[in-house]
């Protein structure tokens, strides 16, 4: 794995058309439904079966599409309380195929989601360089605060603190205030990004 080549891809992506960065392309109705799943996963009394049942109910009610169903089921499978990484990997593959079959204007965002899920599995399994590659792919497809945060997490886990700090500075200079603010909130909340908290971020 050529770290410098991956880093160059990331820096090029951050430089390129930063102010054209879209907001998340999940439509508001689906986003609201997925937030229900997120709240269920944050519960201290998490029951994986109940979380999966919630995902299936939202799908049956037409509140999420097939791609988002597979994405949400992946998130449940990869949750630390479940840690079914074989299932999570299979669901990421199924999500990619579903995204290709669906096509449409959200294709790149849906493929970015599958790349992001693969990166999460690699990250949780200790293959951080591979995770960085997946996160870089996701960022190339969809330049969002979530994908930027994942790249920064992987850089820090690899011990590349200076590169992470430099990238953060570049993001602050190039990206819209909305994205910078979203990333700042994530840095404040995510323990994997704690080393960047002394890097001032102006929204």
Question: What residue spans do the PLM features occupy?
Answer:
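Alpha-helical linker/edge segments of TPR/alpha-solenoid repeat scaffolds
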Residues: 120, 124-126, 157-167, 191-203
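Flexible helix-coil transition and linker loops at the boundaries of alpha-helical arrays
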Residues: 40-43, 58-67, 97-108, 177-180
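Conserved positions within tetratricopeptide repeat
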Residues: 52, 68, 89, 132, ...
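Alpha-helical adaptor scaffolds
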Residues: 72-141, 146, 150-153, 157, ...
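Charged, low-complexity interaction regions
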Residues: 16-25, 45-46, 64, 82
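Amphipathic alpha-helical repeat scaffolds
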Residues: 11, 15, 19, 23, ...
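TPR/TPR-like alpha-solenoid helical repeat scaffolds
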Residues: 106-115, 150-159, 179-199
């Amino acid at each position: 794995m050529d770290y410098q080549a991956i880093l160059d891809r990331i820096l090029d992506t951050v430089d390129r058309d930063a102010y054209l960065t879209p907001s998340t392309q999940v439509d508001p109705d689906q986003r609201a439904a997925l937030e229900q799943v997120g709240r269920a996963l944050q519960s201290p009394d998490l029951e994986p079966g109940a979380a999966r049942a919630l995902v299936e109910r939202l799908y049956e009610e037409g509140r999420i599409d097939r791609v988002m169903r597979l994405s949400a089921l992946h998130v449940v499978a990869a949750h630390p309380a479940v840690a079914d990484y074989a299932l999570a990997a299979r669901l990421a593959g199924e999500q990619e195929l579903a995204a290709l079959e669906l096509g449409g204007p959200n294709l790149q965002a849906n493929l970015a989601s599958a790349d992001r899920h693969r990166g999460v599995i690699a990250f949780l399994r200790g293959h951080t360089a591979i995770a960085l590659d997946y996160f870089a792919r996701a960022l190339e497809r969809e330049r969002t605060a979530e994908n930027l945060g994942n790249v920064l997490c992987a850089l820090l886990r690899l011990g590349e603190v200076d590169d992470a700090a430099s990238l953060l500075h570049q993001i602050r200079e190039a990206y819209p205030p909305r994205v910078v603010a979203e990333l700042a909130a994530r840095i404040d909340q995510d323990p994997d990004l704690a080393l960047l908290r002394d890097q001032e971020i102006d929204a």
